[in-house]
Design a protein with these regions (language model features):
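S-adenosyl-L-methionine
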Residues: 245-269
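Conserved SAM-binding loop of SAM-dependent methyltransferases across substrates and taxa
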Residues: 215-226
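Conserved SAM-binding motif I beta-strand of class I
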Residues: 230-235
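Conserved class I S-adenosyl-L-methionine
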Residues: 203-213
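Conserved Class I S-adenosyl-L-methionine-dependent methyltransferase catalytic core
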Residues: 94-200
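A short, conserved alpha-helix within the catalytic core of class I
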Residues: 284-295
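Conserved beta-strand signature within the Rossmann-like core of class I S-adenosyl-L-methionine
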Residues: 300-312
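Membrane-proximal basic amphipathic "stem/tether" segments
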Residues: 1-96
Length: 367
């Protein structure tokens, strides 16, 4: 372990008279026990905490999805990598010569490692749930829930439900309804947008979701906002489009929700009130981000919300592993940053739950 030096005990050695010298090991302490204790002490001096996993943490780490809620009928047979619809989407996306179709993170090897198709709402590439919370997951989720509900002025927690389908980890606290990371993130994002730009007061609200994933926010917003007139989902990853088509159909979202294929991006609407990008641009190249920003700018969308994976700045993910800043690229397209704040606004809470995501809200200048 770098920076940690372990002082080994004196090992008993033979004397010339056949007896051995007294060991400096504590009475009845085995070598393995001593090594474990010394390793933990050395790690602590280096700022590393070594601790035993509790049973709760072992359960969450053992599997990446919650299978306590069975899959709907036919889901396992349909949600397969060899589904003809997915194969067709992949071929169409691979044939595109646009930056949004060239992936630096969401490549086939990444998806094979980080996504179980039938359990796409589990802890995976779309929504980090258990791996991000680590030990004491239930306690950390409880604290995050209290923070989100404190700002739930729209009372979405009373309108939206969590059923745990497709592998979502759910948590129950007392008589409260089940919550999940999917649900809490959605409640938080919708309330934030309403507080900043009056989302619920816009007649015939139109939303563009770039990097929509499996359709999490589309499902929640269409269920919670009666003024929603149009919600378009688009994603540069064929698997995401495939899952989004399935999930929005399964949830029976209204016709106002559309899933637009990347190879038909010209079918996007001409007018939107807000564009959202949640944990997506951070996983794209700078060229792909600029391509998407051009689509936003040419429609003169008044508001743009970006939630990156990086806590310090808006950054891309390049093939060589570098992460390039792209805030200026947003500003260069006629936008100004009007608000940035942590998604959890208590400094003490963020340290306890170790979630440091930020909201970045931009407004088009001159509106």
């Amino acid at each position: 372990m770098a920076g940690v030096r372990l002082q080994l005990p004196t090992v008993p050695s033979p004397r010339t008279d056949g007896r051995i010298t007294r060991s400096k090991l504590p009475y009845r302490e085995s070598m393995s026990t001593w090594l474990r204790r010394q390793t933990k002490a050395g790690a602590a001096r280096a700022g590393i905490m070594v601790s035993r996993l509790d049973e709760e943490s072992r359960r969450y780490i053992a599997v990446n999805h919650n299978d306590s809620v069975p899959l709907p009928a036919g889901a396992e047979d349909f949600l397969r990598r060899d589904n003809p619809r997915l194969v067709e989407l992949e071929a169409a996306y691979d044939a595109l010569a646009i930056p949004a179709a060239a992936h630096t993170q969401w490549r086939p090897s990444f998806l094979r490692k980080n996504l179980a198709m039938s359990w796409f709402r589990g802890d995976n590439a779309y929504v980090w749930q258990i791996r991000q919370l680590g030990r004491a997951t239930r306690l950390r989720m409880y604290l995050a829930m209290l923070d989100v509900l404190e700002r739930d002025d729209l009372r979405l927690a009373e309108k939206l439900e969590e059923d745990g389908l497709f592998g979502a980890w759910t948590f129950e606290f007392g008589d409260r309804p089940s919550v999940s990371r999917d649900l809490l993130d959605s409640i938080n994002e919708i309330n934030y947008l309403d507080d900043q730009m009056g989302l619920t007061s816009i007649d015939e609200l139109r939303v563009l979701d770039i990097g929509a994933g499996y359709g999490r926010l589309a499902h929640r917003m269409s269920a919670g906002l009666p003024n929603l007139a149009a919600y378009d989902c688009i994603d540069g990853v064929a698997t995401s489009t495939f899952l989004c088509e399935y999930y929005t159909r399964f949830r029976q979202v209204p016709e106002s929700v559309r899933v637009i294929r990347l190879d038909r991006h010209e079918e996007l609407g001409e007018r939107y009130d807000v564009a959202v990008n949640i944990h997506s641009f951070s996983e794209c190249s700078i060229d792909a981000i600029r391509w998407w920003l051009d689509r936003i700018a040419e429609r003169q969308i008044p508001w743009l919300l970006i939630v990156p994976n990086t806590p310090d700045e808006l950054r891309s993910t390049e093939l060589d592993g570098s992460m390039l800043p792209f805030r200026q690229d947003v500003l260069d397209r006629g936008y100004e940053l009007v608000d940035t704040r942590p998604i959890h606004q208590s400094d003490e809470l963020r340290e306890l739950i170790d979630l440091h995501d930020q909201f970045y809200l931009f407004r088009r200048t001159g509106i």
